[in-house]
């Protein structure tokens, strides 16, 4: 097996598992850059996965190929609305942001399973009729070598996730809006003095995290899980949180970290096809992403400094 064949197996599989992590981690970047810790990324992914699956089941046959894309829009809307609970608790009521995020995770899982049981009489939905399918990107898939590796067996959602990472970088670091988001996460009092509404910007940051988290959950459900159960997301939001920290709260850093974790997750699927990993028991491959997550969060891979006001409630006029 030559290097091109190996990469043509590794890269598409990595992109499949990395895409939901990229999207969810980007949401965390916006929230935490605005000064609100978001442990609730797992819950936002659960809401997104649940919404996209139900939308696809209810409307998939009528909408056809448009159903998975529209289900992602529904997932984004649901994630944004659900994130308002965390925003209100953390920003308006100045609750402990870590506790609020954990509550979001618990509420999301409990509420979605309750609704699924009401509808289906069991804790699992049917398989969605219109998932996303791997495809060859027109034109790009015909490029020698690179086309076979990157563009011949890929989901459009993977390309979308990578594109959104660069768009997020541009918004955060090259636009006035991004400057305002970052200012309320670093020096909210100075931002307030300059006329920036700290509460408004933090609400926007958390809602953007809801949009991205819902999108990440929807992508995972529409490309990998294809149904919804209590274990559909199963820690993906926490891995995305690790990618956020590992990426040092930067969109491109989060992209790189998510690709790394995506590769680790893909090994359990493609490991037996690769000469280097084929003799390693699959159980170790399943453990790999979680071990790497722990290493990243404990600072083994490098020190990461959060925005200075991250997790600190802002009280107008208090010094």
Curated annotation (Swiss-Prot):
Transmembrane feature ranges: 6-26, 39-59, 65-85, 99-119, 159-179, 204-224, 235-255, 257-277, 282-302
Localization terms from the record: Cell membrane
Cellular component, GO annotation: plasma membrane
Expression induction: Transcriptionally regulated by CodY.
Keyword annotations: Cell membrane, Membrane, Transmembrane, Transmembrane helix, Transport
Keyword Cell cycle tagged: no
Topological relation to the membrane, as annotated: Multi-pass membrane protein
Gene Ontology molecular functions: transmembrane transporter activity
Coarse class of the protein's main subcellular location: membrane
Binding partners and assembly: The complex is composed of two ATP-binding proteins (NupO), two transmembrane proteins (NupP and NupQ) and a solute-binding protein (NupN).
Function: Part of an ABC transporter complex involved in the uptake of guanosine. Responsible for the translocation of the substrate across the membrane. May be a nucleoside transporter of broad specificity but with various affinities for different substrates.
Family classification: Belongs to the binding-protein-dependent transport system permease family.
Protein name from the UniProt record: Guanosine ABC transporter permease protein NupQ
